[in-house]
């Protein structure tokens, strides 16, 4: 069973004296099959925008208490306060937030020239972070299906947070893995979503060329106390087995994979998603991925229940570097409908039409998009043979 944050056996808080941080072993957050909550997680009708109004799982309690302590200790580049938020008028339902500090104070992205670029130990990587930035290690119990030698995943604060609880999931940083999605990393990301009782805890991945700023394998996880359009957007099946769908009603259509929760279905989904991302990486196609609780594929409505986990994959134009003049840069959260805006002027003037235009500018040319879709459908078909 997952250990609560106030357990006598495990503490996820740093000792008061920072000279002791180096000597403190990284605590384990151990979880098993019964800690993965696939059903019964829904948005409250009365206060969907209030994080504190929802119950916490042991995972939520451990993450939030340890993250809050790091805020108090000043380990972030800036102190994240309540962000000004607006739902942009229109049909999409964009959630825009003003986050000036992240736009100004975040670490400059590394120079990336290829989606397949090798790991460079001389560049910044997660072996170079301060000891206090590590919250704990995710450790799966043997009762969970999947690879027997599943690597441990470090949960690390993002020192330039998008939102409350913004962390990075880093698989065994000493291995020096480049930013290429692997099954163990994806499994940890999906299971983190299932470990949380909050419907707004999301996980995502940016490839190189898809605005990953560090070429060292990591996923993002964070809380956003608002519904996003990807949770319930309708979709149409692309393969006879119904394993791959095309998400509709969004500025950038994405490939939708869906699972009801832990078990063989989840393992099959991980295999299919990684086959797709391997294809994209091998063909130098940048991509972004987003994991959220959501409705099943097909025709959905705003009232559709969040009965499982949606994994959405976008193939997109490569973008090597940050476009400083734009209201926002398009990566995993923007494609999902969450828009962290850099300046007050852009925040006050941003419209749905302008946001749609920025996102659509990252779409692949139609001929290449059709080629990618056909290739991914073929990959799904091969898997079923």
Curated annotation (Swiss-Prot):
Chief location of this protein within or outside the cell: cytoplasm
Organism: Macaca fascicularis
Subcellular location: Cytoplasm
Active site residues of this protein: 218 (tele-gmp-histidine intermediate)
GO CC list: cytoplasm
EC number: 2.7.7.78
InterPro entries associated with the record: GDPGP
Family per record: Belongs to the GDPGP1 family.
GO biological process terms held by the UniProt record: glucose metabolic process
Reaction it catalyzes: GDP-alpha-D-glucose + phosphate = alpha-D-glucose 1-phosphate + GDP + H(+)
Gene Ontology molecular function: GDP-D-glucose phosphorylase activity; guanyl-nucleotide exchange factor activity; hydrolase activity; nucleotide binding
Class in the EC hierarchy, top level: transferase
Function per UniProt: Specific and highly efficient GDP-D-glucose phosphorylase regulating the levels of GDP-D-glucose in cells.
This protein's UniProt keywords: Cytoplasm, Guanine-nucleotide releasing factor, Hydrolase, Nucleotide-binding, Nucleotidyltransferase, Transferase
Protein name per UniProt: GDP-D-glucose phosphorylase 1
């Amino acid at each position: 069973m997952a250990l609560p944050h106030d357990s006598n056996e495990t503490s996820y808080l740093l000792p008061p004296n920072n000279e002791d941080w180096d000597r403190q072993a990284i605590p384990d957050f151990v979880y098993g099959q019964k800690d993965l909550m696939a059903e019964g997680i829904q948005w409250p009708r009365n206060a969907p925008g209030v994080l504190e109004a929802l119950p916490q799982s042991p995972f939520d309690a451990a993450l939030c208490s340890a993250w809050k302590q790091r805020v108090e200790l000043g380990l972030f580049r800036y102190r994240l306060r309540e962000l000004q938020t607006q739902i942009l008028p229109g049909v999409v339902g964009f959630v825009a937030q003003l986050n000036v500090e992240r736009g100004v104070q975040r670490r400059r992205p590394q120079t990336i020239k290829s989606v397949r670029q090798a790991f460079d130990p001389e560049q910044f990587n997660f072996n170079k972070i301060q000891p206090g930035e590590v919250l704990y290690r995710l450790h799966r119990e043997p009762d969970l299906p999947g690879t027997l030698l599943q690597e441990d995943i470090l949960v690390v604060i993002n020192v330039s947070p998008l939102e409350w609880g913004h962390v990075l999931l880093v698989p065994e940083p000493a291995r020096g893995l480049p930013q290429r999605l692997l099954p163990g990393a994806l499994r940890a990301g999906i299971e983190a979503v299932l470990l949380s009782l909050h419907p707004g805890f999301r996980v995502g991945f940016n490839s190189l060329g898809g605005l990953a700023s560090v070429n060292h394998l990591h996923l993002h996880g964070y809380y956003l106390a608002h519904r996003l359009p990807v949770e319930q957007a309708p979709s149409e099946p692309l393969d006879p087995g119904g394993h791959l769908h095309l998400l509709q009603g969004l500025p950038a259509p994405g490939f939708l994979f869906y699972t009801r929760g832990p078990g063989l279905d989840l393992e099959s989904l991980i295999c299919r998603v990684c086959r797709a991302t391997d294809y994209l990486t091998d063909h130098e196609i940048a991509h972004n991925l987003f994991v959220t609780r959501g409705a099943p594929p097909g025709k959905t409505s705003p009232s559709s229940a969040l009965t499982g986990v949606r994994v959405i994959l976008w193939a997109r134009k490569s973008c090597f570097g940050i476009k400083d003049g734009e209201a926002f840069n398009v990566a995993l959260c923007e494609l999902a409908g969450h828009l962290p805006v850099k300046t007050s002027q852009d925040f006050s003037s941003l419209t749905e039409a302008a946001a749609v235009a920025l996102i659509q500018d990252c779409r692949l040319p139609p001929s290449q998009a059709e080629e990618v879709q056909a290739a991914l459908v073929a990959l799904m078909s091969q898997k079923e043979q």
